């Protein structure tokens, strides 16, 4: 989606057949419409949670993006972890946090939420009207955690608007050279630089 995330009307994209994520197996290819329907399926679960801070980790890029976008739409503070290991998470976890992942330690398992109706046609399974009028705030809080040189979680706090400006700068510098290009990245989506290229 080559637009600012904070300007995206997800509801209007519910029927889009444009490619969103292309998997090399051709089995798990996702359209923008698939993505919006999965957000609509997960949104009620996130919105109903009392915790204001969601600790997020998933090695699966698609699950990661569903968690991330849905948490922001539900007005949650998003903390992006670079590992799902409990020994790491326990140092940053508190009573107002929820660990969301596809791992066994997760308090809310995203894989189960997405697989609850695998055989139902997309348009029949989910009513996307729950997303009508919802947008992601440009002032949304996003916190990255990196181990740095100490091995202990170190917090890097950003507003969504800061990240969007970084993406706009990258686009302004390189867009003509990279338009219609295929990117291969060695940096995972749960690290700040990989996040900028994969997610935003």
Locations of regions flagged by a protein language model:
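Conserved AMP-binding A3 loop
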Residues: 31, 133, 141-168
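Conserved S/T- and glycine-rich ATP-binding loop of Class I adenylate-forming
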Residues: 54, 71, 146-149, 183, ...
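Short beta-strand->loop structural element characteristic of the AMP-binding/adenylate-forming
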Residues: 20, 32, 54-59, 64-68, ...
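Conserved AMP-binding loop of ANL adenylate-forming enzymes
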Residues: 56, 174-200
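Conserved ATP-dependent adenylate/AMP-binding module captured primarily in the ANL superfamily
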Residues: 43-47, 68, 78-106, 162-184
């Amino acid at each position: 989606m080559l637009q600012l995330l904070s300007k995206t009307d997800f509801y209007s994209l519910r029927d889009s057949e444009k490619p969103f994520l292309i998997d090399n197996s051709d089995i798990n290819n996702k359209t923008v419409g698939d993505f919006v329907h999965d957000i609509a399926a997960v949104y009620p679960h996130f919105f109903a949670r009392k915790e204001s801070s969601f600790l997020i980790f998933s090695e699966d890029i698609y699950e990661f993006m569903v968690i991330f976008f849905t948490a922001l739409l539900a007005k949650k503070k998003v903390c992006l972890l670079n590992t799902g290991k409990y020994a790491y998470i326990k140092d940053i976890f508190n009573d107002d946090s929820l660990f969301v992942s596809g791992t066994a330690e997760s308090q809310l398992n995203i894989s189960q939420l997405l697989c609850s109706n695998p055989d139902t046609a997309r348009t029949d399974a989910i009513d996307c009207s729950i997303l009508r009028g919802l947008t992601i705030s440009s002032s949304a809080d996003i916190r990255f955690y990196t181990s740095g040189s100490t091995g202990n979680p170190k917090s890097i706090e950003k507003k969504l608007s800061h990240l969007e400006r970084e993406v706009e700068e990258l686009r302004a510098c390189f867009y003509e050279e990279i338009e219609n290009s295929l990117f291969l990245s060695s940096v995972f989506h749960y690290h700040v630089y990989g996040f900028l290229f994969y997610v935003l």
